[in-house]
C-alpha cells in the first residue's frame, strides 16, 4: 500500500519539469525567423548560423539540432522561408517577405497585374475549343460501334465452315493418287523385262 502511494506522486513532478523546459524558449519556428532577421544576409543564412544564434540566445535542449531541421523544412513548405541554396534542411534560407526591399515588391506587383490581365484572354480560348470538342466526340463514337458489331459476327460464322471442308477434300485424292502409279509402273517394268 505504501509503495503504490509513493510511486504515483513521483510521476507528476516529471511532467511539471518537462513543461517548465518548454517555457524557457519560444517555438523553434519563431527562433529561426528571429535568427534570420538578426543576420540580415541578402543571400540567406545557413542552418549552422541559425543553430548558433538559437543556442547562444535561448536555452535549448540537446535535441535542438534535429528540431531546428524539422522546423526549417516546415517553414519552407508553408512558404514562410525561401531556400536560396542547397536541398532540404541544408543550404541557406531567407524570409519570403521580410528581407525583400520595398522597390522589388512594387515591381513584382505591377508585373503580376499585367499577367492577370493577359491570362483571362488566353484561358477563354481553350475553354471554347474544349466545349466544342466533347460534343462532337460522343456523336461519332456510337455510330462506329454499331458498324463494327454486325461486321464481326458473319466473319466468325464463315471461317469454321471453310476449315471443316478443306481437310475432307484434300485427304481423298492423296490416298487415290499413290495407288494408281504403282500399278502402272509395275506393268511397265514387267513388259520391259520380257
UniProtKB/Swiss-Prot annotation:
Residues 24-97 form the H15 domain. GO terms for cellular component: chromatin; euchromatin; nucleosome; nucleus; transcription repressor complex. SUPFAM superfamilies: Winged helix' DNA-binding domain. It comes from the Eukaryota. ADP-ribosylated on Ser-104 in response to DNA damage. Residues 105-194 have a biased composition (Basic residues). It is found in: Nucleus; Chromosome. The modification Citrulline is found at residue 42. Residues 1-26, 86-194 are annotated as: Disordered. The modification N-acetylmethionine is found at residue 1. Gene3D superfamilies: Winged helix-like DNA-binding domain superfamily/Winged helix DNA-binding domain. The modification ADP-ribosylserine is found at residue 104. It holds the Pfam family Linker_histone. GO terms for biological process: chromosome condensation; heterochromatin formation; negative regulation of DNA recombination; nucleosome assembly. The modification N-acetylthreonine is found at residue 2. Keywords: Acetylation, ADP-ribosylation, Chromosome, Citrullination, DNA-binding, Nucleus. The keyword Transmembrane does not apply. GO terms for molecular function: chromatin DNA binding; DNA binding; double-stranded DNA binding; minor groove of adenine-thymine-rich DNA binding; nucleosomal DNA binding; nucleosome binding; structural constituent of chromatin. InterPro entries: H1/H5, Histone_H1/H5_H15, WH-like_DNA-bd_sf, WH_DNA-bd_sf. PANTHER family: HISTONE H1, HISTONE H1.0. Histones H1 are necessary for the condensation of nucleosome chains into higher-order structures. The histones H1.0 are found in cells that are in terminal stages of differentiation or that have low rates of cell division. This is Histone H1.0. It comes from Rattus norvegicus. The lineage of its organism: Eukaryota, Metazoa, Chordata, Craniata, Vertebrata.
